[in-house]
Amino acid sequence: MVSIRPDEISAILKQQISDYDKSVSVSNVGTVLQIGDGIARVYGLEQVMAGELVEFEDGTEGIALNLEDDNVGAVLMGEGVGIQEGSTVKATGKIASVPVSDEMLGRVVTPLGQPMDGKGDIPSTESRLIESIAPGIIKRKSVHEPLQTGITSIDSMIPIGRGQRELIIGDRQTGKTAIAIDTIINQKGEDVVCVYVAVGQKAASVANVVEVLREKGALDYTVIVAASASDPAALQYLAPYTGAAIAESFMYKGKATLVIYDDLTKQAQAYRQMSLLLRRPPGREAYPGDVFYLHSRLLERAAKLSDAMGSGSMTALPIIETQAGDVSAYIPTNVISITDGQIFLSSDLFNSGLRPAINVGISVSRVGGAAQTKAIKKIAGTLKLELAQFDELAAFSQFASDLDEATQKQLGRGKRLRELLKQPQFAPLNLAEQVAIVYAGVKGLIDEVPEDQVTQFSRELRDYLKTNKPEYITKVQTEKVLNEDAETILKAAINEVKSSMLASA
């Protein structure tokens, strides 16, 4: 017979009571009412915040965007194939954020900061909110330092400064991305962190950009954020904000950064798709009413910070694709009004062989002039005006039979200037080379060079200066001015190259 020992029973009960954990885990949970087209309608989630991350049963994440009386509209950031009506949804209590660290340089990441280049995890100890407030007025400083693109026509006529927002706008296949990639390549050795955001592009195009940057040695200081055409609309909408957050993390550490949004037209289309599926009222061109705010809050994050804030900067080059050159459409006019100038690329100029196909007449930089280096400012002051006058004269000369000598001379110089400004892709020029080319054209030193040999002259002049006159290159690159000594060397070099070319012709 088993003997009952009361002391043992009481000891076990005391042990059980002491180990009892009465804490209750409370989580904000809802139920899926409807799912489809990347949108979920969820009942419950009473305590959810606007923009909060929610987690579905199958592990898919979403963002709560519409907080209505009886349900919550959430956009999915994944396929969501395992989600069905009645599935549970859990609020995470977190707003969308992205991990940031120096280890991101040279990597390709998703809009949530996850690596997608097969090189393993990215170690990081801190994260930044994807949506954060732009620096205030007191935290800023006026744009005063140049950001050289390496493209002569831009650096001489439409200069860009650190902290500026300069729009690149044009039809498809006019070289918009090429200008952006050239600008990244030209930052080599300049201690500028670059972020390239690809929105709604073909995965093959993004892979091509990565390969070009790797070949040119530019991937080491570049982060690529990719949301390709096959990704959900929510990720395409988030990608530019992720790019801005990554750039901000470097900017607030006192570094100069450059962000390229390629392109914001596709981001607006992804946002339109989400808004219409969430049953928000459509406005002009079926875009929602807050599509202006979509872009303004993104581009306002670009800034040149004050000395007290560490003097960092974030320069933004948003890209917009137009339809048949129509810059008066809704999204182009919105972004033109937000940015500090635009570089307009024309398909007619592109097809006529002018690359980069920049329409100088309607391209403008509203603040970059203050940041332009003295060397190029001194000689390029009249360049834009001369080219604009040449365009007018060229149009007029088509109808005139006999032109006077002065007009013919002006037309000849205009044509040579046009030829000088042609530049191959992925071959940015340094400041000294740009100064030499523009000087030769503006001062009329190549008026005797045959028009079809101007490109050859430009190439030979650059080679001659590098091999025979390195002191000129060093002087202009370090001092950023074209003083009398440098000008004398340059003039002699131009005449030398010109003489040898004309003699061999």
UniProtKB/Swiss-Prot annotation:
Instruction: Indicate which residues the UniProt annotation says bind ATP.
Output: 170-177
UniProt KW rRNA-binding keyword: no
Q: Does the keyword Transport apply?
A: yes
Coiled coil where?
none
Membrane topology annotation: Peripheral membrane protein
Superkingdom of source: Bacteria
- Which compartment or compartments is the protein found in? Cellular thylakoid membrane
* Pfam families given in the database record: ATP-synt_ab, ATP-synt_ab_C, ATP-synt_ab_N
Which molecular-function annotation in GO is an example for this chain?
ATP binding
List the InterPro entries.
ATP_synth_asu-like_sf, ATP_synth_asu_C, ATP_synth_asu_C_sf, ATP_synth_F1_a_nt-bd_dom, ATP_synth_F1_asu, ATPase_a/bsu_AS, ATPase_F1/V1/A1_a/bsu_N, ATPase_F1/V1/A1_a/bsu_N_sf
Annotated keywords: ATP synthesis, ATP-binding, CF(1), Hydrogen ion transport, Ion transport, Membrane, Nucleotide-binding, Thylakoid, Translocase, Transport
* EC number per UniProt: 7.1.2.2
Kindly state which reaction or reactions the protein catalyses.
ATP + H2O + 4 H(+)(in) = ADP + phosphate + 5 H(+)(out)
Q: Which GO terms describe its cellular component?
A: plasma membrane-derived thylakoid membrane; proton-transporting ATP synthase complex
Q: Per the record, where is site Required for activity? A: 363
Give me the disulphide-bonded residues.
none
PANTHER family cross-referenced by the UniProt entry: ATP SYNTHASE SUBUNIT ALPHA, MITOCHONDRIAL
Q: Which HAMAP family match?
A: ATP_synth_alpha_bact (MF_01346)
Q: What family is this?
A: Belongs to the ATPase alpha/beta chains family.
Describe, as the record does, how this protein assembles with itself and its partners: F-type ATPases have 2 components, CF(1) - the catalytic core - and CF(0) - the membrane proton channel. CF(1) has five subunits: alpha(3), beta(3), gamma(1), delta(1), epsilon(1). CF(0) has four main subunits: a(1), b(1), b'(1) and c(9-12).
Role this protein plays: Produces ATP from ADP in the presence of a proton gradient across the membrane. The alpha chain is a regulatory subunit.
Stated name of the protein: ATP synthase subunit alpha
User: Gene behind this chain?
Assistant: atpA
